[in-house]
Amino acid sequence: VVLNVGDTTLTPEELKLRLQPDLVFTHYRHDLHQDHRVISDFTWNTWRTHLILEYEIPKYDGDLGVPNAFVPLGEAIVKSKARILMESFKTQRTKQWFSEDTFLSLARIRGVECNSPQKYAEAFYCRKLVL
């Protein structure tokens, strides 16, 4: 579930008081895009006691790493996700790397890496997991 918090001028402490998520997604800490790193740092500073998964974004920088958490996905979900990405980030469409093929290919590679029975997977980086 993605929450719309409305006011984007909340301080980290105000945000933390308003939300108590079970799972938090943020950018990969080693993402070479400076804005993405700032968001990742902000996320870890705000929700350091929560389960945080860092996602990857394929782009020119070649900063994809070796993720350690995988979620097997079926083909219909992967295609739907790629379509939603294309619709949601219209400002990125002019970039050569921003294509459905890129997202489908990455999901296929991650599926191979985790031996997904469904052929595809989404991968994340998990720095800290409490069981």
Please provide the spans of the model-predicted regions.
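C-terminal accessory domains and tails appended to enzymatic cores
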Residues: 18-19, 45-51, 55, 70-131
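Histidine-centered beta-alpha loop that forms part of the nucleotide-sugar donor binding/catalytic region
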Residues: 28-29, 56-58
